[in-house]
């Protein structure tokens, strides 16, 4: 009992009243404080306030589910001391731990000691992980003393500073008229050349297949219509093949 010296208020739970006064006096002497008495069979009917005792001593450990009640009766960091217990110490310690006690141990004199946590049941505490570390927040903070700025002018070469030739900025087919550049590399020059060849071939075919609608074209200009394709050409024999030049079908204006 020497480890309980200085505890002011204790509760002694008894089963056998033989020499009860002697045991109570020994507890008073060891603690130096007040000692209250309670029968183990009347414990469930008792109405003690929470955090009433610094120490609870039990003669018999046959309490079933009353360990939780003892936990509420003890003050924070209060002690629970079991003597003359029945059964295996390991299973009894496990039951006490599950009731909320800590630092449960078996003493050398075949007694068990446990402790209530240093806080009240149902109490809360503010968690520290919610705090923001100010040094972490300043990691990405830009400071003019720590950063070296680069002059933008140093990023440009002399060639970059020269003004470009406006002629070099023109792109094929962007000036309103489809006309290829001098050094065309986009394929527009080849496309225009193919279109020109197709147009000339179509005109050539139209002149070769020209037919007379009036039947008087071979007689000469005096007998030809104003839109005759043979206008201006000498007379020829009927059925004779005549080759027309390209400019005959074009307007003079």
Swiss-Prot record:
Disulfide bonds, paired cysteine numbers: none
Source organism, top-level taxon: Eukaryota
Region described as Fe-S binding site B: 214-228
Region spans: Linker: 130-161
Molecular function GO terms recorded: 2 iron, 2 sulfur cluster binding; 4 iron, 4 sulfur cluster binding; electron transfer activity; metal ion binding
Source species: Drosophila willistoni (Fruit fly)
Protein name as catalogued: Anamorsin homolog
Cofactor: [2Fe-2S] cluster; [4Fe-4S] cluster
Chain location of the short sequence motif Cx2C motif 1 per the record: 214-217
Region (Fe-S binding site A): 172-186
Any Pfam family the entry gives: Anamorsin_N
GO cellular component, one term: mitochondrial intermembrane space
Keywords, in A-Z order: 2Fe-2S, 4Fe-4S, Cytoplasm, Iron, Iron-sulfur, Metal-binding, Mitochondrion
Lineage of the species this protein comes from: Eukaryota, Metazoa, Ecdysozoa, Arthropoda, Hexapoda
Free-text domain note: The C-terminal domain binds 2 Fe-S clusters but is otherwise mostly in an intrinsically disordered conformation.
